[in-house]
Regions:
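Acidic/polar-rich alpha-helix caps and helix-coil junctions
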Residues: 1-167
Length: 167
């Protein structure tokens, strides 16, 4: 649903984007809540009830609907206000917890969310964002059809080079 929301945003259809944004959060939370039923001794004391979940999702959808399509950046490269893609990216990253590949490709594809944490030591010099990952040495040694990448900045064929201001 988050990918559909992204596609609808690209098409300028914010209504369908918001609907899929909401559906993505709803499904993600339902999946996490289902984990408690797998453990009979789980302490669900702090688990939110359906009303709390619905209210939280409604607040996020309201924030999404009132956000601008785009926003500017401050002197360090953070957004002056979160725009729709920042909000979508944040929730997509939360839903992808444990599935980093999709989140990594999302930021390479879109440059969002622009709210990612930077280096604490030098926030204005966090280095370049990795565009690829090196092949495992065993793969390079046994597969004569591939060459090891020279660095982490070599783009894959579909990488359009969108950069995140954080990097």
């Amino acid at each position: 649903d988050f990918m559909k929301a992204e596609a609808y945003l690209a098409l300028g259809n914010t209504t369908d984007a918001a609907n899929h944004y909401e559906a993505g959060m709803t499904k993600s939370i339902a999946k996490v809540q289902s984990f408690g039923s797998r453990d009979g001794s789980a302490d669900n004391t702090f688990a939110p009830d359906a009303a709390d979940v619905a209210a939280w999702i409604a607040s996020k959808v309201g924030e999404f609907n009132s956000a601008a399509a785009t926003s500017g950046l401050d002197a360090v490269g953070y957004p002056t206000a979160k725009d729709k893609m920042d909000l979508l990216g944040e929730q997509y990253f939360i839903a992808m917890y444990g599935g980093a590949g999709d989140a990594f490709n999302f930021i390479r594809r879109t440059g969002y969310p622009r709210t990612l944490a930077r280096s604490l030591a030098t926030p204005t010099e966090s280095g370049s964002f990795p565009r690829t990952i090196l092949y495992p040495s065993g793969e390079v040694a046994t597969n004569p059809n591939i060459l090891q990448r020279l660095d982490l900045n070599t783009k894959v064929f579909w990488d359009t080079g969108v950069t995140n201001p954080a990097n």
